[in-house]
């Protein structure tokens, strides 16, 4: 088995905020109003953007080369085959001299994590089972693509 080592490109939280403004202006043709760092992991960073016209989106920056095609493809597959709502990809942008990493913008879907929601603990056993069935069905649909 061939194992490749993926090297993450350097990208600070502060840089992502400025880069999000640039990407939104270039790709959507409008100014970003409020930008807020959401979080990140080994290979990505996410920024919440509220445009001055009210549109909300998330810009995800990919710190590993050639990840954008896979991520965009996976989101499209999920949108097609999954029973859960998946954000639409609004734009993709290759890294260049202005923004050195690939990024894409996607629709922002409001919601909370059900994993730690107090309400999930308080609902009845039947409703918790129904929720678990929905999650299982969605996971099965995703892995059957």
Annotated model-derived regions:
Residues 1-32:
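Juxta-kinase regulatory segment immediately upstream of eukaryotic protein kinase catalytic domains
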